[in-house]
UniProtKB/Swiss-Prot annotation:
This protein's encoding gene: nucS
GO molecular function term, any single one: DNA binding
Domain of life per record: Bacteria
Protein family membership: Belongs to the NucS endonuclease family.
The protein's role, per its UniProt record: Cleaves both 3' and 5' ssDNA extremities of branched DNA structures.
EC number, UniProt record: 3.1.-.-
Organism ancestry: Bacteria, Bacillati, Actinomycetota, Actinomycetes, Mycobacteriales
Top-level EC class as recorded in UniProt: hydrolase
Protein name as it appears in the record: Endonuclease NucS
Matching NCBIfam families: PRK03298.1
Main subcellular localisation: cytoplasm
Organism the protein comes from: Corynebacterium efficiens (strain DSM 44549 / YS-314 / AJ 12310 / JCM 11189 / NBRC 100395)
Record localization: Cytoplasm
Amino acid sequence: MRLVIARCSVDYIGRLEAHLPMADRLLMVKADGSVSIHADDRAYKPLNWMTPPCTLTETPITDEDGEEVGVHLWVVENKKGEQLRITVEKIHSELSHDLGVDPGLVKDGVEDHLQELLAEHITTLGEGYTLVRREYPTAIGPVDILCRDADGQTVAVEIKRRGNIDGVEQLSRYLELLNRDELLKPVQGVFAAQEIKPQARTLAEDRGIRCVTLDYQTLRGIESNELTLF
């Protein structure tokens, strides 16, 4: 992981063109080759980014006499020929660190069992639902459950024991990525938990994500009437 806080401008050249004027930003270069540009807002969302596989070349800019002027041009290019051209005027801070292989999110026993049970009884989410697979792999981690509704539309399900805002944000990231896949989109989201905090429910509904309150005992086959769908 390489983190660079720098004064820079950014130009995207590809299917369309976009420009970010000169300003202080965070440049994040990950070991997988991805590069993203962040401002001090927008939560986790970058201003612009390039996903792997891509290449990064850094070249000093020179004047007409061939002398370096203290400015560097970063060119990030993917296989399609799309480019991020980052003009780095000044680096304020730079840090590189090998984070190693991340073990990923580890669910507690109840969450893992909820996922297993919901996959077995996927029609809990609605009549006509069918399971695609558990732990559907993506570039940013596995989606708990990927399924299809009665109309054949793709649905991504995030399962939590206690549903809070972090879980909604996590599902939102999955949806943003999955909806770029021509074979899957449009992808809807379901946030499922034994208990969903009011703030999380409000955020989910604002983003068009359906909330499902799960009764663990019902899914285990024990009589209960507390399963509620929203």
